[in-house]
């Protein structure tokens, strides 16, 4: 199995950026923690200028800050609304958001930008994948900006540790999520199944034959569509079978008995029982009614609800587990980071934007517009969130599942390994390959990567294992 070019260790990244060995010690460090309005003196990085952007004429003369946003569609539209509100709330800063596609697109674009030394002011990487850029000294610490009104205590606890390294904060939570099990409630009711959906994989296996009695476009209705890039969902799956991708001692365990059992269950369900299949776009198939189930992000809840309005009722449930096993889901989504550049004024302006977005009502609006978790604790008490849950209980399911959220295993801390996991799953989901052989080959690749990154990960002094 080939190693992905996105899988960059600190040494690889430093070499790619043309930085000598002496640069490895130049960790981004800020001033001692101070009050609000402070600045992270020492995080300025000469020679790294701002990437091109266009400032609307009505905002000329303000300090411009550029966010390369890994969002498209509805989520990007809601982000643009939040940025517009920030720009109207004051007269010194203009925040510009530019959609760059998804997380993998951002990873590639930002890596190239660092090499060219023309960078955005804000980036937003998923889970722990920001570490490769922290390790190349590309991100500025945030702690000196915190005060009594804006600090890490305002955010949901499960997500805070993922933004810290070696005692400093480099990411504040923003577009955070968990995976959910989505199902076609209308079809479940038609099939005489519990309208609250399945709780376990055994439930889904029991429900699938009843769903298959319903024909859609001349074919039996599938119980589940999976994607070729299901590595995030698979983290919940393997935990739900009592296994793990890796342990806290940096040993890859994805090919142990629990992992093989999980992937063999999926192989049989798809290729022998014919109750599921690998889709090019599971979300599209779900919205069109071809499949009665899929796994998706809470961040897709608003869009999925809109896409199926008037067609069928969407139901959501916690991610499935094997009967008798603990339900756990990986934290997902991303947080906001300031990119080290040649302007302290822009760094400070970014922090003001982060402070604005951490207001409870703004967090609630982001949640309502997208489905991302209302990451600010106080947002749950806003009328916006209360009304939303009352109108659509699926949002309440997403909130209730947060107690099961935990940080993904080390294997999921970099984009390259995530890509490798997805490719391995696709061999089983799509081709019916032998799970044990696939996982053994995958484990060897993942272990090589983890060994390469271990020193960097240990230096993080991660505080979030639970």
Predicted feature locations:
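Extracytoplasmic "Venus flytrap"/periplasmic binding protein-like
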Residues: 82-155, 190-192, 292-293, 307-309, ...
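Short, well-ordered beta-strand elements
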Residues: 61-72, 93-98, 122
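Extracytoplasmic/periplasmic solute-binding protein
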Residues: 166-174, 179, 202-251, 258, ...
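Long, aromatic- and glycine/proline-rich binding clefts that accommodate carbohydrate-like moieties
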Residues: 91, 158-160, 317, 368-427, ...
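Extracytoplasmic/periplasmic substrate-recognition and gating elements
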Residues: 61, 88-89, 189-191, 264-277, ...
